């Protein structure tokens, strides 16, 4: 009997909602990346996008240590000479907490052609509300040790 090879149309995609309140950023990113890639499914294949949709809410309440809020830097470059900008994660969390969480999750995904397709299934919101109630997302609980 030949080995089963999943195809892109064979998978049924679910919607998961993750509440980021008091969850460590790295643990949240790993859990979301695994759901996005479909590593929790028995039909996982690294060359097929068989993952689920993930909604992250309360991104502004994610747990980041004070040391990292002050000292960890986020870099961006405009492409022009001398165009390097660096900001602390604390500054970014004040203005755009959803971007900080999204960047952490995307950083956990593979760097290949499939990555953009996987990233399109991620939705991050700073507050508790999201516009995806019609998809009936299932709450996903991240098991972690108390801080």
Curated annotation (Swiss-Prot):
Keywords annotated in UniProt: Ribonucleoprotein, Ribosomal protein
Question: What is one Gene Ontology biological process annotated in the Swiss-Prot or TrEMBL record?
Answer: translation
GO MF assignments: mRNA binding; structural constituent of ribosome
Q: Which residues cross the membrane?
A: none
Coiled-coil positions are: none
Superkingdom of the organism of origin: Bacteria
Cite the Pfam families for this sequence: Ribosomal_L13
Tell me the disulfide pairings in this chain: none
Q: Name one GO cellular component term.
A: cytosolic large ribosomal subunit
HAMAP family the record matches: Ribosomal_uL13
User: Record's family?
Assistant: Belongs to the universal ribosomal protein uL13 family.
UniProt function note: This protein is one of the early assembly proteins of the 50S ribosomal subunit, although it is not seen to bind rRNA by itself. It is important during the early stages of 50S assembly.
The record's note on quaternary structure and interaction partners says: Part of the 50S ribosomal subunit.
What is the name of the protein in this document?
Large ribosomal subunit protein uL13
Gene coding for it: rplM
């Amino acid at each position: 009997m030949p080995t089963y090879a999943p195809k892109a149309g064979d998978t049924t995609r679910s919607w998961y909602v993750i509440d980021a309140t008091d969850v460590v950023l790295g643990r949240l990113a790993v859990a979301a990346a695994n759901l996005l890639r479909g590593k929790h499914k028995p039909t996982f294949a690294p060359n097929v996008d068989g993952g689920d949709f993930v909604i992250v809410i309360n991104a502004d309440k994610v747990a980041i240590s004070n040391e990292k809020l002050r000292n960890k830097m986020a870099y961006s470059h405009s492409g022009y000479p001398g165009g390097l900008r660096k900001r602390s994660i604390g500054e970014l969390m004040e203005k755009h907490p959803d971007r900080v969480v999204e960047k952490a999750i995307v950083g956990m995904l593979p760097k290949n052609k499939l990555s953009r397709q996987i990233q399109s299934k991620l939705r991050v919101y700073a507050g508790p509300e999201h516009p995806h109630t019609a998809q009936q997302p299932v709450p996903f609980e991240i098991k972690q040790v108390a801080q």
